[in-house]
């Protein structure tokens, strides 16, 4: 644009030079003074040509600077787009995960759940979990009935934890995005303030020009001063941009340092975790070694018992061989009774010794059997008790951890929602401020138009005065003076221009350095993006592993239940076997009562009494252990009460923090009100100045009419008046300088306020870092839970192997007992027959001995007493079993109460979440209203652009009329020289003013177009996110539907119809916004074409 304006000026200068040269040659023949005048005019033209060339160079430099600024803006927009794309990707991943969690619950819902709910309750998707329906209370009640606390299947609780964790991450990402938007709005506000100040300065300068009808030299000097001011403002802008870029680079470096520190902390935490896991592994290995040693010891004891049983078997075989030999000897002795009576007595003694040995062996066998039975039963009972205790402890520990995690997540969500509310209020305040600023800009633009009209009228009157001055000879002297002044001013301007070129070169070097820094920052940002993607992939892998672990845990718990049922069956079968053993023992005792061996029975009863006493001692020990467990449970309840008190204290602290934040918001609102009052005062001042300028213009018109009637008298008066106005202008400049100082002070105050806002942003960033640390703690807890689950799996596998071994050993012992019982029955039958035969033989000869032998056992032993004692013992055991069952019932009742409390807590949490999501829906409605207001503002801007086009057409018509008037004046031969001189000066001034006006107009249009582009990009991205969300939800609904009927119901449900309506609504505003952008581009291109034509 700058190049086109310079080229048009070049062609105009060429057209002007050719008639000037012809006229100079024509006058050369007349007289020598005219030659001197022509030489002076030629020098002026050469200087003007130089100035035009310099102006072209300046225009080129400005064009390059604009291109560079456009490129820089494009790079910044590219960065914004990349950031927004990353945010959209994170949102899409979050939506996919949330939709995955929702699809699991969709299969469990019925058709009534999908059909329930009104449109107002279902048509709002909250940002954290958009696929959840928080408006249907019946569906919540149904989910409550399903999602009770179950220790068999705890996947529901874990999915809720995943949902909370994802919502935390989404809220943190939204906080970061809102912070970036807040910083953008601050920068935009500062730019708009600078532009308003610049416009006000231009207005004051133009109004001063309208007031003062100065000579062309003064006007040229003023124009040069304006150029210097503009260059200074551009320098200041460049310096500010450099400072901003430096601050941005410093902020990015600080952020990188923080991220590196966080990464180092994360690595240290991971190393600590690895060390803890290694120590835990070592402890587990030690425990396994101890368990192996105990198993080896138990196996060694079993092997010794088996060896003892085998030795007893060998002894029994030997005894059978001895018995057979004795039978043979008894048959021989029965034949030779008469001859061998002495030998018979010895044989009888020997038999008694053998029988005593047999009785001792049988006692040992019975003792060993009882020991084996009791050892097996005790070991199995102890193992079962240990397993149950461990499971109960683990379940209680997991429940406490889940409660702590849910509480922490709730606190974090509350804090983040509060932060979101604050940020939304701040955004609304900034939107109102921007609307007011736009209104003020429009008023300022109207004032500038009126001032331009006034300046044009003043120029017309000046042209008439110049025509009157051309009739007099004194004008030539003044012209020479003006030429000298113009030459001096042009020389000064050249020097200043050279200085400015040097400054621009320095600025270009600094800009190149800044571009290098920006490229480095972009590379670092790409690396950070790659790290983010890697972290997200790791999180997804961890989630998959957690789901696998949960499924494995559910399967293991089902296997444990099946194993418990098997153990119960085994216990019942064992009780049956014990009854059978008891029956067999009763038969044995009956046979022994028939054989009247009461001495043997007394010894057995003594041994059994000792064993029963040992069992009683063991039962007492178990009772003491149960009491200790009860005390531990009471202590755990006390700890839980202390934790609740701590949580109450934390809630009180959070409320205090909330009050402090509300105070800060009230301060911000007060500051905004003060700014609004300042803008109102400025607007009133501008209106007053406008009225004053209009009055002065009226006075000027009346004075110009009087000047036409009185030429020579009024010229002197005008000179005096001009001098007075110069003094007034100097005074006015001083007042303006004082006002500029005041404005600088106000700018310092605003900077202080901005620093306060930055400090608040830093506080918000610190809170975000705290939330990230909390997320890290949750990850640590998640890894600890994972390690505990792996340890449980190992422990369950070890228990399964131990149970299998015990079952094999029990079967082997059963087989051995059956063999021993059969052998015992056969041996006792043979012994009974032999004893009966011996008793018959001895009763023939010695009846008295038989009476003494039979009477002894009745005195020493009574079987009825033994039965009574055994019955009392059995009754006592039954009573103890009943007491233990009552204790178990009480503990189960307590567990049920705890579960009910947990259910109530979960229901309360769900109600709170519903309230929060309703608040979020209200805020979304407010955002929709704000978008509508923005569309109305865009329509108003379009109308104003059309008005600008009409005004430009009027300006072009005025320019054409002025050209026609100038052509008419050129027809007069005497006024040609004066008109050409003034025309050159006026064209140079007008060309510079046009370049300035075009630059300001194109800058305003560029800002408006960039604003529209940002809005359209944001809308398209929101539409894309909504479309991906809708596609994901639709596909998941199809995948997880139970049948084609459920699919048809889902499509006919109000939710799906709302989705379709939502997509239509999002497409319509985007198309409207595209049309608006097209109209804006068209309106902006029309004035450009008109300016090119001019």
UniProtKB/Swiss-Prot annotation:
<dbReference type="GO" id="GO:0120316">
    <property type="term" value="P:sperm flagellum assembly"/>
</dbReference>
<keyword id="KW-0206">Cytoskeleton</keyword>
<feature type="region of interest" description="Disordered">
    <location>
        <begin position="319"/>
        <end position="345"/>
    </location>
</feature>
<dbReference type="GO" id="GO:0008104">
    <property type="term" value="P:protein localization"/>
</dbReference>
<feature type="region of interest" description="Disordered">
    <location>
        <begin position="1"/>
        <end position="29"/>
    </location>
</feature>
<dbReference type="GO" id="GO:0031965">
    <property type="term" value="C:nuclear membrane"/>
</dbReference>
<dbReference type="GO" id="GO:0000922">
    <property type="term" value="C:spindle pole"/>
</dbReference>
<feature type="coiled-coil region">
    <location>
        <begin position="879"/>
        <end position="959"/>
    </location>
</feature>
<feature type="region of interest" description="Disordered">
    <location>
        <begin position="987"/>
        <end position="1018"/>
    </location>
</feature>
<keyword id="KW-0963">Cytoplasm</keyword>
<protein>
    <recommendedName>
        <fullName>Centrosomal protein of 128 kDa</fullName>
    </recommendedName>
</protein>
<keyword id="KW-0175">Coiled coil</keyword>
<dbReference type="GO" id="GO:0010468">
    <property type="term" value="P:regulation of gene expression"/>
</dbReference>
<feature type="modified residue" description="Phosphoserine">
    <location>
        <position position="31"/>
    </location>
</feature>
<dbReference type="GO" id="GO:0005814">
    <property type="term" value="C:centriole"/>
</dbReference>
<feature type="region of interest" description="Disordered">
    <location>
        <begin position="1067"/>
        <end position="1094"/>
    </location>
</feature>
<feature type="compositionally biased region" description="Basic and acidic residues">
    <location>
        <begin position="7"/>
        <end position="17"/>
    </location>
</feature>
<feature type="coiled-coil region">
    <location>
        <begin position="190"/>
        <end position="827"/>
    </location>
</feature>
<dbReference type="GO" id="GO:0005794">
    <property type="term" value="C:Golgi apparatus"/>
</dbReference>
<feature type="region of interest" description="Disordered">
    <location>
        <begin position="115"/>
        <end position="140"/>
    </location>
</feature>
<feature type="modified residue" description="Phosphoserine">
    <location>
        <position position="291"/>
    </location>
</feature>
<feature type="modified residue" description="Phosphoserine">
    <location>
        <position position="1061"/>
    </location>
</feature>
<feature type="compositionally biased region" description="Basic and acidic residues">
    <location>
        <begin position="987"/>
        <end position="999"/>
    </location>
</feature>
<dbReference type="GO" id="GO:0005813">
    <property type="term" value="C:centrosome"/>
</dbReference>
<keyword id="KW-0597">Phosphoprotein</keyword>
<feature type="modified residue" description="Phosphoserine">
    <location>
        <position position="331"/>
    </location>
</feature>
<dbReference type="GO" id="GO:0120103">
    <property type="term" value="C:centriolar subdistal appendage"/>
</dbReference>
<feature type="modified residue" description="Phosphoserine">
    <location>
        <position position="249"/>
    </location>
</feature>
<dbReference type="InterPro" id="IPR026652">
    <property type="entry name" value="CEP128"/>
</dbReference>
<feature type="compositionally biased region" description="Basic residues">
    <location>
        <begin position="1000"/>
        <end position="1009"/>
    </location>
</feature>
<feature type="compositionally biased region" description="Polar residues">
    <location>
        <begin position="328"/>
        <end position="342"/>
    </location>
</feature>
